[in-house]
Amino acid sequence: MKSYLRLNNEVLHHYNRTGKLDLAKDREAVRRYFLEYVNVKWRHFANAGEKICFLVAEGYYEKEFLEQYDMAFIEELFQRAYSYNYRFPSFMSASKFYDSYAMKSRDGKEILEKYEDRIVITALYLARGDKELAERAVNAMMTAYQPATPTALNSGKR
């Protein structure tokens, strides 16, 4: 059994016994999940521009909504999202995102999006060329707002 799953099971068993979550163990499960799963499957891109070009060329992203923005703005928006230094608060939230929302390669062997990437693409897609709205959407989604599942899951994807 993967160590992050073992730790998550321990968190759940502890909760069932005591009614309290072992948050230290949960944080360790998140850390191990990234080390043993996400980072291993992550496809590295040199920068946001390279990532966008690859995902459009390979038919993962719709190009039409991205063409409403210049690449400098898109890269700046990615930097803004990453500047929040977002960390998943629990193993369950991280695994739900990477199992259900993050874009993966068609064969499932590579993870193509991180949380911040999905946020930026969703914001760009919904803003339809309005840079100020895209910026506000990234800020809202990185701090509190979560769009409904179909929107978060499908925005910008082919």
Predicted features, each with a name:
Residues 1-158:
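Extended catalytic cores of very large enzyme megasubunits
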